[in-house]
Design a protein with these regions (language model features):
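Cytosolic nucleotide-utilizing catalytic cores of signal-transduction proteins
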Residues: 13, 24-47, 51-280
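Short, charged amphipathic alpha-helical surface segments
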Residues: 1-19
Length: 280
């Protein structure tokens, strides 16, 4: 009987948590239900969204569950064919790098045991049960923003999205307006792939002409000539910090605007809600 009671309580807790992150329970009811289930409401918890890429394996749920043996405090929930949510209770001593290490363990386990590639979004820490839904949405946003700006990363932390998070919330019309203002002389498409590669390397090397020319295996004067050419085409001198910032942001906005034809934007809690954006 005791084993059955524990199983039922665990099952009910998992269902309760799933209802919270899915917004299927009223905020006022969270307190009542938590009390009924003897659920501690105000401990810190991290929220991970594990998305299987290329192919999904139903065994992924069990593989991840095995990493979290404390079934009363940690919850591993299947929310779709490809998505699994992990909600882990934290101690006060855990640092940001410890939270990322958990995601790395999940990624490694799924890859080594099932040969399945994943991308993992991490929301900010929830300090109360009622915050779980927002933290789950943050993990979703982390993955969506990562798909645009951090394609090489498999673990994306919402806290580290930086300017990408701001750009992600811009409406299409504002993106287009900004790009037309920045590139008054010529559109960004006027820059060929080699020129764009030069620009990216210049940014990677902190606008250092000597270091960039070394990385590109070109003479310093050749790089200066290219930068002058960019200035002539765009009106922006990338050697000037303010111009470089404007250009960098414009490149990110352009990348984001291009992605709007095929990505689904989800609610961020404060941003706009779920809508599939299609451009003609």
């Amino acid at each position: 009987n005791e084993a059955r009671t524990n199983y039922e309580e665990k099952h009910n807790k998992a269902t309760f948590v799933k209802n919270i992150i899915s917004d299927n329970i009223l905020p006022g009811d969270v307190y009542v239900r938590a009390k009924e289930l003897h659920f501690v409401t105000d401990v810190p918890r991290s929220v991970y969204l594990v998305r299987q890429l290329d192919r999904s394996d139903v065994a992924a749920l069990e593989v991840i569950q095995n990493l979290f043996p404390d079934r009363q405090r940690d919850f591993v929930l299947s929310v779709s064919e490809t998505d699994i949510v992990v909600i882990k209770e934290l101690t006060r001593e855990e640092r940001p790098e410890d939270i990322v290490a958990v995601a790395e363990n999940i990624e490694n386990a799924v890859r080594s045991e099932l040969l399945v590639k994943t991308v993992i979004g991490i929301g900010t820490t929830a300090y109360h049960l009622r915050e779980l839904a927002d933290r789950y949405k943050e993990a979703q946003v982390a993955i969506e923003v990562g798909k645009v700006f951090d394609t090489e990363k498999s673990i994306i932390n919402y806290e580290n999205l930086g300017i990408g998070r701001i750009i992600y919330q811009l409406p299409t019309t504002l993106c287009e307006m900004f790009l037309s203002e920045v590139f008054k002389k010529n559109p960004i498409e006027a820059l060929d792939p080699d020129t764009l590669e030069t620009i990216n390397k210049f940014f990677e090397n902190n606008l250092n002409v000597s270091e960039t020319s070394r990385k590109l295996y070109v003479h310093r004067n050749t790089l200066v000539y290219r930068l002058e050419k960019i200035k002539k085409i765009t009106g922006l001198d990338l050697r000037e910090f303010d111009h470089a910032i404007v250009f960098k942001v414009a490149m990110m906005v352009k990348k984001y605007a291009g992605s709007l034809t095929h990505i689904s934007l989800r609610c961020t809690g404060t941003a706009r809600c779920s809508e599939e954006i299609q451009h003609p």
